[in-house]
């Protein structure tokens, strides 16, 4: 079972590696688990996708620039 910290950590890695394209990557992962019938894993990847989207949104980037 993935913890909330695990999910945020994974989302951060994906956001750093792929930027906004990481949202699509996480969505594809969620879809693959849905097709495979692994509903709990799909839910984890949907959560990761939402967090990658939050981390890569323009508002998030603006806030990061203001904090430096």
PLM regions: where:
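Long, non-catalytic architectural segments outside compact domain cores
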Residues: 1-32, 36, 40, 47, ...
């Amino acid at each position: 079972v993935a913890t909330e910290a695990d999910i945020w950590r994974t989302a951060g890695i994906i956001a750093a590696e792929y930027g906004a394209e990481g949202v699509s990557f996480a969505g594809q992962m969620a879809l693959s688990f849905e097709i495979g019938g692994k509903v709990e894993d799909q839910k984890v990847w949907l959560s990761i996708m939402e967090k990658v989207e939050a981390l890569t949104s323009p508002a998030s980037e603006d806030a990061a620039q203001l904090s430096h």
